[in-house]
């Protein structure tokens, strides 16, 4: 997690999925393996990606404290979705800067658990509209780093409205992104 002061904290408790290591243990194991030139497991590589997600929060120029989910807007939903999407595309470069090599990029992008449903649905719009995912990544990376967090809600909607032909309101889009599968299925049908 990331605080308003830019401090990053780590969960030292075991994972809910029955995993034997905490996220902190997986991260420290990954860093030690990179230092020793050893290959990372998927879980260790994903721990680096999760850490990089938090680093991205500190890199943004337009960082602002947003209201929690469910408080009448979707600013945090948009920001976390974009941050996670960008992080999954960029974390391998971070591993390289640390001296390691990412080997699970496709799996991390597809099977990462952070904001899983939102990122899957975000990528589904990209695929269905036949938008080049690398182009979308570059577009949103720039907006994330150089724009304001609070502007991402409208930025994501306008991007998909223009590039994917969304025919629903911004509120309907975000309610479906966060909501149940039936709502989402109805939204994705409008993508062209």
What are these regions (language model features)?
Residues 110-192:
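Pan-zinc metallopeptidase signature
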Residues 12-51, 71-74:
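Short pre-active-site segment immediately N-terminal to the catalytic Zn-binding motif
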Residues 45-66, 80, 84, 88:
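Active-site recognition of the HExxH zinc-binding catalytic motif
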Residues 8:
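Short, surface-exposed loop/strand segments
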Residues 71-117:
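Post-HExxH zinc-binding segment in Zn-dependent metallohydrolases
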């Amino acid at each position: 997690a990331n605080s308003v002061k830019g401090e990053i904290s780590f969960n030292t408790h075991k994972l809910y999925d029955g995993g034997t290591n905490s996220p902190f243990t997986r991260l420290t194991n990954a860093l030690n393996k990179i230092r020793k030139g050893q290959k990372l497991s998927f879980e260790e590589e994903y721990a680096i990606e999760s850490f990089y997600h938090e680093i991205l929060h500190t890199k943004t120029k337009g960082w602002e404290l947003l209201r929690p989910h469910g408080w009448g807007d979707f600013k945090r939903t948009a920001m976390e979705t974009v941050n996670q999407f960008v992080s999954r595309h960029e974390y391998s470069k971070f591993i390289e800067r640390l001296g390691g090599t990412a080997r699970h990029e496709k799996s991390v992008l597809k099977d990462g658990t952070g904001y899983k449903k939102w990122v899957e649905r975000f990528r589904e719009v990209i695929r269905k509209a036949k938008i080049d995912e690398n182009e979308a990544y570059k577009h949103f990376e720039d907006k994330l780093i150089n724009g304001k967090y609070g502007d991402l809600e409208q930025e994501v909607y306008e991007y998909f409205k223009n590039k994917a032909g969304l025919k629903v309101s911004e509120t309907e889009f975000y309610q479906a992104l966060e909501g149940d599968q039936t709502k989402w299925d109805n939204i994705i049908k409008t993508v062209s």
